[in-house]
Amino acid sequence: MLRRDSFTYEIQYTNAAEKFFRKHEDVREEYKAAIKELLAGDHPEKVDVKKISGKKSDYYRIRLGNYRVVYAVINGKIVVINTILAGPRGDVYKKMTGLK
């Protein structure tokens, strides 16, 4: 769990995301840095993030070079970033069709 000024946040990973990040630690570090940048609010425009439209409208994606990370934010006292998928662009969007 990480603290950021006045709130606490936690990044969680699904099994699929964890499997990807075990092979791509550099992308995991980029992702964590992007989340910190977004939450800090200093320069959120530096992070290429978009809300996903359609059935998965409560999901967001971060673009990290050729990779995409799909996540959802759960609010409360602790902000939980639930990392759903990570992988090459085409693979991530294909796998999203199987999400509930």
Predicted regions and their residues:
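Residues that form or immediately flank small-molecule/cofactor binding pockets and catalytic motifs
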Residues: 16, 54-57, 88
